[in-house]
């Protein structure tokens, strides 16, 4: 899917089970403990409006519960893993999507508004208020009915690099959890304002974290690290 000219938004999604080299690479890396597998939507398909604006999959789709189940099954069959975390396509998730991952008991890489949480389960209001009292807020693990949430920052060519560094510094002072998401096909792309590659910026951020004494853990361990 990284070759956007050839594969981006194809009409028929191609299951990961048909990509044998990728399955082999991922399987070996999982055994070595080098990576974790998360569910990132089902096919990442956008709805294109007449004005050409794009609506992300977990906003516009109505069959999200079945899509989550099918996605979990595909990853289980392909890699032998039971995924526990969900990353919304385009970092966007609506109320239906939130209900779907809650039912599947998948933790969310991202945060949602209190109103959506309450519509899924009114008890979530109490959890949301409690989370705000955490010393690490907003960089703490937020626990709700059926799932947890962790804030996730994006590093892409158009990301605000100075804001990302500022957020990292705030997180460091609060001893919170800092997660950065990026795309492998953008690794060699230059940042719009910094004029350095995304790889260079990511390595710079990792170096800053290492120098500050940060502990590097996987997402699953981060979710288990604390309670809000």
Briefly describe each language-model feature range.
Residues 1-85, 91-142, 161-180, 191-228:
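Catalytic alpha-helical scaffold of carbohydrate-active enzymes acting on polysaccharides/glycoconjugates
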Residues 141-162:
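Acidic/glycine-enriched edge-of-secondary-structure segments
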Residues 185-189:
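Short acidic, S/G/P-rich loop/turn micro-motifs used as interaction or catalytic elements
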């Amino acid at each position: 899917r990284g070759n956007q000219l050839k594969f981006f938004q194809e009409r028929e999604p191609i299951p990961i089970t048909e990509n044998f080299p990728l399955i082999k690479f991922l399987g070996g890396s999982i055994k070595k403990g080098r990576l974790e597998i998360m569910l990132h939507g089902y096919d990442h398909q956008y709805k294109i409006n007449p004005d050409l604006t794009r609506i992300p999959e977990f906003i516009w789709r109505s069959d999200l519960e079945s899509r989550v189940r099918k996605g979990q099954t595909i990853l289980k069959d392909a890699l032998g893993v039971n995924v526990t975390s969900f990353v919304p396509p385009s970092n966007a998730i609506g109320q239906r999507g939130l209900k779907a991952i809650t039912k599947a008991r998948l933790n969310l890489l991202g945060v949602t508004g209190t109103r959506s949480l309450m519509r899924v389960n009114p008890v979530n209001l109490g959890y949301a208020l409690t989370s705000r009292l955490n010393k690490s807020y907003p960089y703490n693990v937020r626990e709700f009915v059926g799932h947890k949430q962790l804030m996730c920052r994006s590093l892409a060519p158009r990301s605000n690099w100075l804001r990302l560094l500022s957020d990292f510094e705030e997180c460091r002072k609060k001893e919170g959890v800092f997660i950065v998401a990026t795309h492998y096909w953008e690794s060699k792309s230059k940042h719009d304002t910094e004029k350095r590659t995304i790889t260079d910026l990511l390595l710079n951020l990792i170096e800053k974290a290492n120098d500050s004494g940060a502990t590097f853990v996987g997402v699953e361990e981060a979710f288990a690290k604390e309670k809000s």
